[in-house]
């Protein structure tokens, strides 16, 4: 697999996977992998981006010859559009029972992943996800794997990184506001924020959930203004992220804003807000400036930078494909064991994840990934913290930090 990754920058065709080097004369039946994502509804853009990463990885593996140990069998993606948790179980069951997939990748939205993984666990089918919620790998399940850190880790880092930068800028904060969408992702990440604030001796001036799909953020923003908070930590998907930042800017609430990933770190955030996005910080699970050569190839084709979902789900598919190759089998149990044992580092999509690897602990949680801080600068997101990962300086309260 390593050889193909080394040719990424120069390959004319998109080569975004490891070379599995088969040489066979007889065509093998494809290896079916299920893909569960919200391709319609309010989170469709996340699902579309995630599917792009999965398809890029699968296409390149197939172009390189397929799964070597299975005689060059090609990967066949079986995609299910799952816009809400209510449809996740039935859609995933169809993939397992009718399509007989050997593994599943998805579903970005934590509440959808929680529902889908109930089905894969009962069926004994491995699933790899980038969803954040702590519950995903805290249920004692055997067949679910998270390529990212968990949500409370992101929440804690979201707060602790902000404290570090504010202190460096000579502008420490005392009054904080926490807003979060009320599904599994937002609730878990807000818990991490809350715990970090408590550890710092700070009681949030605002700590408020709002419903997913909110259409009027005016009450939240009015509370923010009245609180006289020094900083705000919103944990949002996409439409809610746009509404919160737009309302803040329109009401000239000019305080450091640290988003909770998701809607704050995709190109559509900039498209939707224009100059209002400038200077906004966010926690992030990955960033394209870790893999500039891959990003250049992606941008030439898609016109935007490679998003975190593309990186994380490309890495997830790559890990699953390598596990199938190592297992030398279509048996989901053997594939599951190979997923758990594998550690893939510093190659392809995995290099775009802080920590540089896809690898898992005994619970299925990533054993290497950690969050980074990114900041909007014009059309770009720059990784600015921690120092070991930074690709540029942070600008905090108007001060450029070294």
Q: What is each residue range found by the language model?
A:
Residues 2-11, 27-402:
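Extracytosolic ligand-binding ectodomains
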């Amino acid at each position: 697999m390593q050889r193909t990754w080394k040719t990424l920058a120069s390959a004319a065709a998109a080569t975004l996977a490891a070379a599995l080097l088969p040489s066979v004369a007889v065509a093998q039946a494809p290896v079916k992998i299920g893909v569960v994502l919200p391709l319609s509804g309010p989170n469709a853009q996340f699902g579309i981006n995630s599917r792009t990463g999965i398809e890029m990885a699968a296409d390149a593996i197939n172009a390189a010859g397929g799964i070597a140990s299975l005689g060059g069998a090609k990967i066949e993606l079986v995609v299910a559009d799952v816009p809400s948790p209510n449809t996740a179980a039935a859609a995933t069951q169809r993939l397992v029972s009718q399509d007989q997939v050997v593994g599943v990748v998805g579903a970005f939205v934590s509440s959808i992943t929680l529902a889908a993984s109930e089905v894969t666990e009962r069926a004994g089918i491995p699933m790899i996800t980038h969803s954040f919620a702590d519950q995903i790998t805290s249920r004692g399940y055997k067949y679910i794997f998270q390529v990212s850190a968990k949500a409370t880790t992101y929440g804690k880092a979201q707060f602790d990184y902000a404290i570090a930068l504010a202190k460096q800028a000579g502008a420490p904060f005392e009054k904080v506001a926490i807003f979060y969408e009320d599904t599994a992702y937002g609730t878990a990440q807000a818990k991490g924020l809350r715990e970090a604030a408590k550890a710092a001796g700070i009681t949030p001036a605002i700590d408020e959930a709002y419903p997913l799909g909110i259409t009027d953020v005016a009450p939240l923003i009015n509370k923010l203004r009245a609180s006289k908070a020094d900083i705000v930590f919103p944990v949002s998907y996409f439409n809610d992220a746009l509404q919160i930042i737009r309302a803040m800017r329109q009401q000239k609430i000019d305080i450091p804003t640290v988003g909770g990933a998701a809607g704050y770190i995709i190109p559509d955030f900039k498209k939707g807000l224009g100059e209002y996005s400038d200077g906004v910080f966010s926690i992030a699970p990955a960033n394209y400036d870790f893999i500039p050569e891959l990003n250049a190839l992606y941008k030439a084709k898609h016109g935007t930078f490679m998003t975190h979902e593309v990186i994380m789900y490309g890495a997830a598919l790559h890990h699953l494909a390598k596990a199938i190759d190592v297992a030398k089998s279509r048996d989901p149990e053997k594939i599951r064991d190979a997923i758990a044992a594998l550690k893939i580092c510093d190659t392809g999509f995995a290099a775009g994840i802080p920590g540089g690897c896809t690898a898992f602990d005994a619970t299925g949680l990533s054993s290497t990934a950690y969050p980074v801080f990114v900041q909007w600068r014009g059309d770009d997101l720059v990784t600015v913290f921690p120092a070991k990962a930074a690709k540029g300086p942070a600008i905090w309260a108007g001060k450029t930090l070294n």
